[in-house]
Amino acid sequence: MQVYGEEGRRKVERHRQLRKGKGFATIERTTRVDLAEPEAGATVLLECMTNLAANEMFSGEGQEDAAGGREQGPGATETVIGSRILEDVERLYAKCRNLVIVTGEVASDGISYDESTESYIRLLQRVNCSLCQQAEEAYEVVYTIPVCLKKKPEEPAVGKESL
């Protein structure tokens, strides 16, 4: 999360305390999650895709210039940025044992926004759908209640006879 002001710092610290002792590797990056170097066999928590998508779309921070082949900032299309985010997440996943991604749903209020915000919403929807398709498991938390959207099929027990 790009931290702005005291409220942002308090929010980040609160989240750090909530994760403490849960077995997640903490790597703090506002963009380019593929550059993170978790310890071998780590379970990585990527929190939060809504912030990462906004940072990748609007800040341009940490991006290579045109010679490096990474289009950046508001001039880049949501399709280009979405593909880049998904590639970065794939490279991060290749470096760890488990990857847990927290995201948010930001378009259910029925409000019309300016074009750059609508573009961000489309970007996040595209990324979230793709991540859910690739995930072994996916949950939506509704008023603190986890609702399973997708669950990894249980493997049959060895030695059990079929019915």
Where are these regions (language model features)?
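Conserved nucleotide-binding/hydrolysis micro-motifs of P-loop NTPases
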Residues: Q2-G5, T50-L52, V106-S108, I145-V147
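Short, surface-exposed amphipathic charged segments that create phosphate/polyanion-binding patches used
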Residues: E39-L46, P153-E155
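Short amphipathic alpha-helices and their capping/turn segments at secondary-structure boundaries
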Residues: T26-A42, R84-C96
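Active-site flanking residues adjacent to catalytic metal/cofactor-binding acidic residues
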Residues: I27, L46-E47, T103
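Conserved P-loop
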Residues: M1-E39
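A basic- and aromatic-enriched beta-loop-alpha substructure that forms the phosphate/nucleotide-
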Residues: K22, T31, A42-A67
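Conserved protein kinase catalytic core
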Residues: D34, A53-A54, G110-I111
